[in-house]
């Protein structure tokens, strides 16, 4: 950029354009405990130096603009500006690097993911000096995270509400996702819950369409839950999708769900938006509802390796905005997810304190202090043969969700649920006895299928089903 000019109060205002690195590249800066830290993967245009590109990211996501303005003299840029404090090359990439940026806490509204993202991943992603830009990770300091309510209830409170301990929870998305009448939909919910599942689920795009209005679906699903609970003696639930075109309509649906006495509602947090999601999370805590979160649209944001935002950032944002469950990939199913990377953001969802670990894509140590954890949901192209791997990978504090892997059972919905419950109980028992599920998992399933005809039928129909594609998002 040229020409270069500097604005100094002692000599008055000088108009013009200056290099961002003169103000926003500060390698000597020592980060503060209260700073929000960001790691950006930067691919600059040819000829743009790394220091200038990193400084441009810091400037355009905080106080900077393209030219010197006289109102700079009315405030303290040193207090409010973002700072690119470190740059490191990306191994194996010729013109790409990680730029570390520190933001002072005063730049952000308390308790607002919306404001946080508007600044950090706003206009800067369209900046012409950059060919591509990806936000890899954020460090949220306790001074900021404590301004958020976080999940409505969290993992331990959910287990206490359900009275279910020592194993993953089992779920199922009702299929076909669109086209069923409310009564037939409720029938499928009942059959799956009666067969042994803990939860059933609205698919993400089930809202209130002409073939099934939301109120009818809520009523028939509540009836199915009550009937299944009475027959099994277990607490059951169905994720009633409250996502709507307006926040007011969304809250109206959540209120009706509470009046029906169901334990959980659902929200599509990316398509619905963070403001709506935080509002719903507050309502759920105040009214005793669990909140299941679907991440529909995430791959538009996080799938490309060089541009967008990694899902670990969206996961952290969800923990602050509020949700008791969130879909997190499967590692073994039909949806994207490398094992180490997936387990990295699963820990960021569940644990209180997570150490920096670049081998898992965790760029910063994260301390959530007392914020409740979020239960990861494994869903998408999974079936009974995946149960040992899922149990071993995700552990007890997770939801394993089989849609087609339940309703695709050759004998019907209830036998499909039975097959999954038997497979899960067998895997948990084998693990508790000290068996290695990673090595002996298939044998555990075969042994269990000898005394469960439902599981045997499921094993037979899905024995050849695999989703073997290369993972796009690698470290």
From Swiss-Prot:
It holds the Pfam family RuBisCO_large_N. Binds 1 Mg(2+) ion per subunit. Keywords: Acetylation, Calvin cycle, Carbon dioxide fixation, Chloroplast, Disulfide bond, Lyase, Magnesium, Metal-binding, Methylation, Monooxygenase, Oxidoreductase, Photorespiration, Photosynthesis, Plastid. GO terms for molecular function: magnesium ion binding; monooxygenase activity; ribulose-bisphosphate carboxylase activity. It is found in: Plastid, Chloroplast. The keyword S-adenosyl-L-methionine does not apply. One of its GO terms (biological process) is reductive pentose-phosphate cycle. Its cofactor is Mg(2+). GO terms for cellular component: chloroplast. SUPFAM superfamilies: RuBisCo, C-terminal domain, RuBisCO, large subunit, small (N-terminal) domain. Mg(2+) binds at residues 201, 203-204. The record marks 334 as: Transition state stabilizer. It catalyses: 2 (2R)-3-phosphoglycerate + 2 H(+) = D-ribulose 1,5-bisphosphate + CO2 + H2O; D-ribulose 1,5-bisphosphate + O2 = 2-phosphoglycolate + (2R)-3-phosphoglycerate + 2 H(+). Belongs to the RuBisCO large chain family. Type I subfamily. RuBisCO catalyzes two reactions: the carboxylation of D-ribulose 1,5-bisphosphate, the primary event in carbon dioxide fixation, as well as the oxidative fragmentation of the pentose substrate in the photorespiration process. Both reactions occur simultaneously and in competition at the same active site. This is Ribulose bisphosphate carboxylase large chain.
